[in-house]
């Protein structure tokens, strides 16, 4: 895509109705994590003509007036285009987990392609749909959130509006699809134009994946993800302000920037990136041609892709370390920064930025285990007796680089435990605040002296008792007693006003880390002889009996009084005759339970 042409005044009235409206860049995600972020991606279009579209293109042509064809690398006849990118598993001595992952896909197209493209058609109604797979797994059909699809002309080299360049951007939250970090990620069936665009506006299409992950061996980083859409051209560019962090108080300030954009050209210079007002360069990205149709990482071109073209013909994505020698761009104790894409010649369309800066922040970790009266660890045990006395032990410490304050630890007892706590033991500096019998919530407050940076483990413990009243055992899987401890806290130096939250894990692993999950034990009880019982008075012609929700199946039968036998298979049973009614409730993986009315 080339520079905007100047318009004659008498044409302005007819053109202004199609001028693109920018979407302001706003934070999508902001969190302080001990970890980092990864950005990869690929184009879905490649130079065709006499060469295979799956062959890497390393030439210097721009994306106009050439034949653009779909790449299709997945060896799957059911998809019409595809490309992939590899992510290497980060090396660490600690456990890692994905905190957040987003997939973006974007294209520059023309109305002429929407009207005339065939096999397959370019369908606006399907812009928000792609296929996404991890490794050798099956494709997931994604429906994205629209970031930009105004159907406006964003650039033109002539007066034919059907050939004016338009653009779309969509994203999807794919966090729950990623079980690991390292994998080959493939995107397919992305709506994109193909063929030869002869007006000079050009076609472009590609995708990028951003992964934010926790790794307790790494420093605390405040990571902010932004998306929006801007037509950047000479004299017209956005300033993206970032706040909600505080850099380290001394020593080097380390930051990383991520981005994705359409229409940066390898051969058209002048598109640049400023950080806090200073033009920057990065490995693989010249200061005077920062957006240059490439995928890069901290060391330069990222070719762990298929196809592995060095020229992606109008699609850019990457991540780089901020060149901050002597903290000249980002100072100690800084709390704001500004990212500014701009140009003196080419026009291009950034739609994603990420800001990742090492900060000072506390990090509370909590381990929760279960013990019997003989002080045996019975976490995950499957033979706990009805009415057994047990003890929860909660350990906590601060592994961050900032002191913590205002730490409040909260436990909510499940209904399968008696509504009381006993024998509460806390270290000096921890206060048992309250136990609310209505909400079954127990709270502890912790003095900041116990949670200074890199503090030692502290332990809270209290007694609980497994319920011994059959009417306390009504819900699905009630005999699988699982719950977590949660905590809220603030940093002493970290300025985040919303503070921090965390949940417990069942066992501290490497680096005092773990995956947040409930602590579990199972009560071994035959519920045939322990049914929930309730008396319902038949005052009118009918009475409604309602069993507990959440089971897979229900089987009602009348066991005494009048017409006995099976009565229904729904959760709710309407009866018109006095007697005894029993419902058998089943759920896969859980004990069979009963109710009697």
Show where each model-derived region lies.
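Bacterial Sec-dependent N-terminal signal peptides
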Residues: 1-22, 530, 539
């Amino acid at each position: 895509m080339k520079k905007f042409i100047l318009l004659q005044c008498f044409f302005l009235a007819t053109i202004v109705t199609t001028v693109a409206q920018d979407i302001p860049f706003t934070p999508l995600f902001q969190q302080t994590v001990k970890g980092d972020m990864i950005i990869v991606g690929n184009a879905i279009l490649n130079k065709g003509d006499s060469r295979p579209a799956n062959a890497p293109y390393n030439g210097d042509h721009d994306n106009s007036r050439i034949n653009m064809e779909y790449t299709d690398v997945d060896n799957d006849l059911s998809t019409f285009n595809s490309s992939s990118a590899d992510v290497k598993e980060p090396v660490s001595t600690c456990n890692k987990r994905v905190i957040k992952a987003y997939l973006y896909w974007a294209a520059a197209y023309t109305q002429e392609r929407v009207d005339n493209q065939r096999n397959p058609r370019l369908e606006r109604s399907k812009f928000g749909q792609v296929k996404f797979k991890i490794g050798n797994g099956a494709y997931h059909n994604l429906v994205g959130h629209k970031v930009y699809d105004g159907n406006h002309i964003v650039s033109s080299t002539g007066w034919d509006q059907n050939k004016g360049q338009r653009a779309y951007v969509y994203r999807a939250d794919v966090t729950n699809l990623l079980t690991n970090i390292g994998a080959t990620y493939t995107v397919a069936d992305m709506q994109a134009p193909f063929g030869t665009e002869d007006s000079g506006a050009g076609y472009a299409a590609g995708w990028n994946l951003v992964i934010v992950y926790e790794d307790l061996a790494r420093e605390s980083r405040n990571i902010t993800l932004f998306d929006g859409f801007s037509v950047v051209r000479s004299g017209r560019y956005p300033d993206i302000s970032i706040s909600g962090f505080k850099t380290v108080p001394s020593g080097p300030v380390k930051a990383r920037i991520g981005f994705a954009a359409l229409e940066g050209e390898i051969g058209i210079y002048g598109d640049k990136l400023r950080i806090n007002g200073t033009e920057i360069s990065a490995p693989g990205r010249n200061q005077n041609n920062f957006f240059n149709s490439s995928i890069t990482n901290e060391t330069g071109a990222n070719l762990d892709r298929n196809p592995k073209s060095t020229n992606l013909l109008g699609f850019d994505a990457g991540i780089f370390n901020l060149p901050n020698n002597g903290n000249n761009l980002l100072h100690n104790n800084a709390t704001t920064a500004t990212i500014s894409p701009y140009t003196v010649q080419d026009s291009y369309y950034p739609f994603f930025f990420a800001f990742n800066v090492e900060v000072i922040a506390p990090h509370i970790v909590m381990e929760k285990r279960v013990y019997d009266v003989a002080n045996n660890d019975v976490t995950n045990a499957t033979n706990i007796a009805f009415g057994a006395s047990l003890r929860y032990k909660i350990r906590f410490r601060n592994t961050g680089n900032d002191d913590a304050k205002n730490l409040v630890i909260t436990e909510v007892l499940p209904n399968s435990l008696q509504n009381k706590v006993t024998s509460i033991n806390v270290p000096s500096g921890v206060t048992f605040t309250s136990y609310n019998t209505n909400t079954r919530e127990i709270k502890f407050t912790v003095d900041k002296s116990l949670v200074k940076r890199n503090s030692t483990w502290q332990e809270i413990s209290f007694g609980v008792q497994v319920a011994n009243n059959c009417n306390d055992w009504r819900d699905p899987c009630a005999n699988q007693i699982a719950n977590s401890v949660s905590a809220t806290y603030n940093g002493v130096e970290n300025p985040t006003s919303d503070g921090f939250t965390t949940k417990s894990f069942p066992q501290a692993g490497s680096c005092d880390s773990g995956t947040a999950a409930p602590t579990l034990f199972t009560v071994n009880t035959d519920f045939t002889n322990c049914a929930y019982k309730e008396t319902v008075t038949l005052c009118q012609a009918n009475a409604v009996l309602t069993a507990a929700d959440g089971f897979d199946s229900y089987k009602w039968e009348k066991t005494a009084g009048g017409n006995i036998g099976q009565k229904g298979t729904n959760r709710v049973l309407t009866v018109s005759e006095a007697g005894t009614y029993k419902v058998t409730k089943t759920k896969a993986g859980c004990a069979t339970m009963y109710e009697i009315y």
